[in-house]
Amino acid sequence: MIRARACVRRALFFVSLFFFPLFAQDARGGVERGVTGINAERPASRIPFINFDIREPQTNREVAFSVQLLLLLTLISLAPSILLLMTAFLRLSIVLDFIKRALSLQQVPPTQVLHGIALFLALFIMWPVFTEIYAKSFKPLTDGQVDIQTAYTEAERPLRVFMYRQMAHDPSSVRLCMSMAKLPKPDTLADVPTYVLIPAFILHELTVAFQIGIFLYLPFIIVDMVVASILMSMGMIMLPPVQISLPFKLVLFVLVDGWNLLIDRLFHSFL
């Protein structure tokens, strides 16, 4: 009987140890909720109220503002395409992919890494252009010194100069796009519309990138041919030459300081 009572007491003791923290936590939570309810009228931080009201425009100024807002949203949605096709990113990404294939590398470096390298190199090359756009377009617009039309013109001019400067030595792409648009032969940059200059720049960048790719492939093709001829002379026809030539390609690329040489030539090709 005494043992039974002792067991019951021990059981009640352990139960109280288990449930007492839960009750204490619940009671503390109730107190905190009560305090929160008392201080509910005292917000810790002020959050601005934002209201999007869709209604009929009352004045012509409201109509113009709505159109400008739609144009701004359209420009923001086109920002990735502008970054990919109207900057140095197109040439850089294609050339980096060419060097990866010329070295017979399948997964190293990954495609996402190559695109990241091309993106930051493009930002590095385009930084003076972006700085000029910020100083002459974005900052005056935010300060209220110019309107949206003037800001657009000032932002467009540095990009047009950059694209036209790349095609100054070979304006064949400009002539081709001007002829397809049935426009007269331009004498200056101002005579080339932007909707013609952009596709001409894209065609020029594709042409230049493929020309660079040809020069990148030539030394590594020679290595492949030498390795293949040696394997055939030794009777190892079933052995893939790519597996044997890959280390020699890597050694050649490292010995000539390939990455620094490639990035340096790409950078100076835009100057």
UniProtKB/Swiss-Prot annotation:
Gene Ontology cellular component annotations, sorted alphabetically: bacterial-type flagellum basal body; plasma membrane
Domain of life: Bacteria
Keywords: Bacterial flagellum, Bacterial flagellum biogenesis, Bacterial flagellum protein export, Cell membrane, Membrane, Protein transport, Transmembrane, Transmembrane helix, Transport
Pfam families to which the protein is assigned, alphabetical: FliP
Membrane protein topology class: Multi-pass membrane protein
Residue ranges crossing the lipid bilayer per the database entry: 11-31, 70-90, 113-133, 190-210, 212-232, 236-256
Location relative to the cell: Cell membrane; Bacterial flagellum basal body
Record bears the keyword Membrane: yes
Keyword check for Ligase: no
GO biological process, one term: bacterial-type flagellum organization
Family named by the database record: Belongs to the FliP/MopC/SpaP family.
Function: Plays a role in the flagellum-specific transport system.
Name of the protein described by the UniProt record: Flagellar biosynthetic protein FliP
Organism per entry: Treponema pallidum (strain Nichols)
Gene name of the encoded protein: fliP
